[in-house]
Amino acid sequence: METSILGYYLFDREEHGLINALNWNKENKSLLKHPDIKDRKTIWTLLKAKGITSNNLQPRDLVDSALSEYIYKDSHQIAYKDTEELNEIVSDSSVLDNRFNFIYYPNIDISAHVFGVGSDQWHEEVGIFEMFIKNLNSTQSKKMYTLITADHGLTNISNENRIHLDYEEDVVVYGDQRSVYINGDETKVKKIFKNVPGRFLNSVEIRHLIGEPTNNLNKRLYPDHCFLVDDGYIIFPKHLKANLVGYHGGITEEEMRVPVIEIINF
């Protein structure tokens, strides 16, 4: 709640409407500098205050994006084009020595989205990642702390369990496709979701799930309702058309599991 980024898609009631939180545009990225959150401290801010320098390595197309500038504020961002270039970067001891290093490695996550968990392409990416870890372990400097992650777990969704919703403009469906936010009249919303396997959350349950809105920006982005889609199902709001194989955003154990590799050498 303190970040105001409540899901994959947000909805600003006052000005910007629907917002893709992964891809802010020229018009809506000003929200990330809103007075309610502009002084928010990140973990990188805390490390910097303690005199601990930190590196944040991530794909080149993510570096300097509005979202990266927001969530990685006060970290030193290093871009890499592909796994080969990442290997070259981490082989340079001057990059990693005596620092806290965070590496975001999304290739496995992307292959799971596009081809599915357990697919040949997914296994291939896992193998490439294993070789990268072996290389990192063999070339690491004497003093380093490195944390590597690749988003969180996914679940494959069969074609027959993909539900396309039909609704009028006075209802807004956003958030994630398995943990759905909705704005609009409750009776209308329940009718729209009546054939979707899952659970409708009331306002009290929503606050237990994502917390209380604590400032004006939170209130602008806070949903009226939430619907948790059952395991194995997914919904498609009107603004999303892409058919992937693997999805996450739900509350199953496999989706909430965050893969993390920790390397300590000092």
List each language-model region with its residue ranges.
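Feature captures the catalytic ectodomains and active-site-proximal regions of enzymes
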Residues: 1-266
